[in-house]
């Protein structure tokens, strides 16, 4: 009997030990799995690269010179307003404009015959506004380009606002009218126009009651022989100036040049002769340029100026 009891006790101990051994092995596996997961999530791969720093671009805050919006035109077909106007060293001057189309067709709004402080300057601005809609835009003025003309403060902007049908180009314009804006608060009596400094090599080609035309100098540039000119329109209308019947050293070479100058304004212009055209005529040095200097009223094409000119460049420059 005692032997039976001993056998039973021995079997019970073996079963207990086997059960304990199974639990320990399962715990180890579970623990190893947990350690593996935690290691993958926390430990980052080693790297020798330095941490990157965010590079932020510094932008200059524009200086608002005219903070208000001014309605220049408001009729049954459209409304046009300017402002605010801001200027910065990087972006130049930006004139905010608002165009309202009140018609049943698309309209083209544009600035033509633009001048800044009395000097012609073309910002190449035009927009199309769908029927019944309003469009906001910006007219950008390159202040660096103005500085080459002696303008260091934009005190006056004059432009002809043209509003025309985008669908029927032959129709009469809705608007074709001049406006003047004074961004810095000056007036027509107080605005300061730049004074042109005379150039030693300049030649006055025409100076009468309608027009002053000066050839400042001639020089060789990339691919072109260039005559830089200064023009003043003394009339009350827009002038279309041009060179006609042009010869260089007695040979036909046409630069196909024209320039529009608004009433009472001045302009710098470059008359360009292509090197290829000059070389085709065997011209290596420009000794003389002859032409008819003409000026027409842009409204009705009345000829106001026609003067035969023979221009001899002061500084010789080899073509090309």
Description of each model-found segment:
Residues 92, 119-179, 184-186, 224, ...:
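Short, solvent-exposed, Trp/other aromatic-anchored flexible loops in extracytoplasmic proteins
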Residues 54-70, 163-203, 315:
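A eukaryote-biased signal for short, well-structured alpha-helical docking elements
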Residues 16-19:
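C-terminal motif of bacterial Sec signal peptides marking the signal peptidase cleavage site
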Residues 89-96, 221-228:
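Short, solvent-exposed loop/turn segments enriched in Ser/Thr/Gly
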Residues 105-112, 237-245, 284:
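Short, hydrophobic/aromatic beta-strand segments
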Residues 99-104, 230-236:
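Asparagine-centered strand-capping/turn motif at beta-strand->loop junctions
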Residues 23-78, 193, 199-206:
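N-terminal, intrinsically disordered, polar/charged segments of Gram-positive cell-envelope systems
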Residues 2-10, 14:
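Sec-dependent signal peptide recognition
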């Amino acid at each position: 009997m005692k032997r039976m009891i001993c056998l039973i006790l021995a079997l019970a101990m073996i079963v207990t030990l086997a059960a304990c051994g199974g639990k320990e092995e399962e715990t180890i596996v579970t623990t190893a799995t947990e350690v593996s997961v935690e290691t993958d999530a926390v430990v980052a791969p080693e790297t020798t690269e330095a941490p990157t720093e965010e590079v932020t671009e510094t932008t200059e805050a524009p200086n608002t010179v005219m903070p208000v919006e001014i309605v220049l035109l408001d009729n049954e077909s459209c409304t046009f307003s300017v402002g605010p106007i801001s200027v910065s060293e990087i972006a130049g001057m930006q004139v905010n404009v608002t165009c309202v189309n009140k018609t049943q067709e698309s309209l083209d709004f544009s600035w033509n015959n633009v001048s800044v402080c009395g000097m012609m300057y073309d910002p190449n601005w035009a927009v199309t506004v769908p029927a019944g809609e309003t469009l906001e835009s910006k007219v950008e003025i390159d202040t660096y380009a103005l500085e080459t003309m002696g303008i260091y403060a934009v005190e006056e902007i004059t432009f002809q606002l043209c509003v025309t049908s985008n669908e029927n180009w032959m129709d009469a314009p809705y608007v074709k009218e001049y406006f003047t804006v004074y961004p810095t608060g000056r007036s027509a009596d107080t605005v300061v126009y730049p004074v042109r400094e005379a150039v030693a090599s300049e030649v006055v080609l025409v100076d009468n009651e309608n027009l002053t035309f000066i050839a400042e100098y001639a020089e060789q540039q990339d691919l072109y022989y260039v005559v830089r000119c200064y023009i003043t329109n003394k009339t009350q209308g827009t002038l279309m100036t041009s060179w006609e019947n042009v010869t260089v050293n007695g040979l036909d070479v046409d630069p196909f040049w024209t320039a529009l100058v608004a009433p009472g304004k001045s302009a710098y212009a470059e008359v360009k002769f292509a090197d290829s055209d000059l070389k085709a005529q065997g011209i290596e040095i420009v000794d003389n340029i002859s032409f008819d200097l003409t000026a027409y009223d842009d409204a009705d094409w009345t000829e106001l100026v026609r003067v035969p000119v023979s221009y001899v460049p002061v500084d010789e420059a080899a073509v090309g």
